[in-house]
Each structure stands twice: as structure tokens, then as C-alpha cells.
Design a protein with these regions (language model features):
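Boundary/junction segments of secreted and surface-exposed precursor proteins
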Residues: 17-23
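Glycine- and acidic
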Residues: 50-58, 173-178
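Alpha-helical phosphate/pyrophosphate-handling elements in metalloenzyme active cores
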Residues: 55-92, 105
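Divalent metal-dependent catalytic cores for phosphoryl transfer on phosphate-bearing substrates
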Residues: 83-231
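Short alpha-helical hairpin
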Residues: 33-50
Length: 231
């Protein structure tokens, strides 16, 4: 059925992932847009059935969460506005919803890229005040001043924070929580950078493989994904 993809790993019985009817009707008018959406969902399937590396206690809400956000977006768009949107507009919005939490799934390679590698000085003009290196330094200084109560709330410990050794392959659970909280705070920015390819090694896969999304499309997807965490 057009607009339906099966995610048997998570749901176990081949239950479909449903694109809201308003969106499905629109993208069904353009075979390329429909193909792009379905291929993106297939490319990212594994992310919705695995716990992120830096969130050991993360609750897997997978495609259910994506469906809820898609439905919220669909309900927020008035019918008159919907009539003005093209199939491509809707396909980019769907892609942004799929990508919006991807910053939470950054791997060690991705973290090292933004904090130790060539991504550490990156910032997007007009959107970022600080580079990743500056954001990380500011974050560490902040959490090292936390009260015992705050340390317990965020990290489950009441002792002073020690900066994680990002070069280590044996990060402790506390190290992962510290890194994970940093990713959580900036996951909207990360989603944007993943979409535009600033972090090509951070996801261990090409999420746009087999699609015809252009560079401009990916920028728009990234900005839309980023917007859910912008003031």
C-alpha cells in the first residue's frame, strides 16, 4: 500500500507505519516524493529499534513517537494551508520529523568528530553563537558547578564531575550520561548538521542513500528538524 512501510523488528507482527492521511494524499500525487519518503524510512529503520549509545536508560519509543509527531503536525496544518502545500513540501516535512531526534543517536565516532576532530570548530552562520568545542567547554564548566541535588538529578551521583576522556574506548556509565546530556541539549542542532552532511561519519550510515533529495532539500529538512529545539 502506498504510504505504508512495515517495521517487523519493533512491532513483531508486521504492523504498518502510517503516514497521516492528509500527508499521504499529497505525496501520492508525486511518485518521486513518495519514493523519497519511503526510502528514508527504510534507511533509518534500525535507529528506531536500538537504544542510543549514550543513553543506556533511554526508553525505545521508536516509530510510535514519529507517528505521533507526524499526526501533531498534520493536525496543526489548516485545510486551507494544506491546499497550498506541494507534495515536495510535505515530503520535506515528513523527512524532518523522521530526523528530528537523530542527534540522540550519535556514535562515538560522531562525538569525537564534533569535539576532537574537524567538526569541533564548526558553527552555522546566523544560527550558532559557539563552535562545538566552545559549547562542550561551557557545558563542562556548568555541570562542575552543579549542586549535589542537580548532580543526582542529571547523573545519579552527588560527587564532583570529572571530564570524560573522549579518546577512551571504555567510557564509564557516568561518562556516557555526561556526554548524553550534552547531546540531548543540542540534539536539534545535531539533526540539522546530520541532514546537511556535516556529520557524515556520526551516524554510521548514509540516511539519504537511494533518495533524490537535493542539497537544498537537505538544508530545508535540517532547518525544519532543528526548529523544534530553537527558541
Amino acid at each position: 500500500t502506498a504510504g505504508v512501510v512495515y517495521w517487523e523488528k519493533e512491532r513483531g507482527m508486521g504492523m504498518p507505519v502510517i503516514i497521516p492521511e492528509k500527508f499521504k494524499k499529497k505525496i501520492n500525487k508525486d511518485s518521486e516524493c513518495l519514493a523519497n519518503v519511503l526510502r528514508l524510512i527504510q534507511n533509518t529503520e534500525s535507529l528506531f529499534v536500538e537504544r542510543p549509545e549514550f543513553f543506556p536508560d533511554y526508553t525505545i519509543h521508536g516509530i510510535t513517537h514519529i507517528e505521533k509527531v507526524l499526526n501533531y503536525a498534520s493536525n496543526l496544518i489548516a485545510e486551507q494551508t494544506m491546499k497550498k502545500l506541494t507534495a515536495k513540501d510535505v515530503s520535506l516535512l515528513i523527512a524532518a520529523v523522521i530526523l528530528h531526534d537523530f542527534g540522540m543517536f550519535l556514535t562515538k565516532a560522531g562525538v569525537r568528530k564534533i569535539l576532537l576532530g574537524d567538526g569541533r570548530t564548526h558553527r552555522t552562520e546566523h544560527l550558532d553563537k559557539c563552535s562545538w568545542e566552545e559549547e562542550w567547554d561551557a557545558y563542562l564548566k556548568q555541570i562542575k558547578r552543579y549542586s549535589e541535588e542537580k548532580l543526582m538529578y542529571y547523573f545519579g551521583i552527588g560527587t564532583m564531575i570529572i571530564s570524560p576522556d573522549l579518546t577512551s574506548n571504555n567510557l564509564s556509565d557516568i561518562d556516557k550520561l555526561i556526554i548524553g546530556e550534552f547531546l540531548r541539549r543540542h540534539h536539534h542542532r545535531l539533526a540539522h548538521e546530520i541532514a546537511i552532511g556535516v556529520l557524515p561519519g556520526g551516524m554510521d550510515q548514509d540516511i539519504f542513500a537511494g533518495t533524490s533529495f537535493t542539497k537544498a532539500d537537505k538544508e530545508e529538512i535540517g532547518i525544519l528538524a532543528r526548529s523544534h529545539g530553537m527558541p
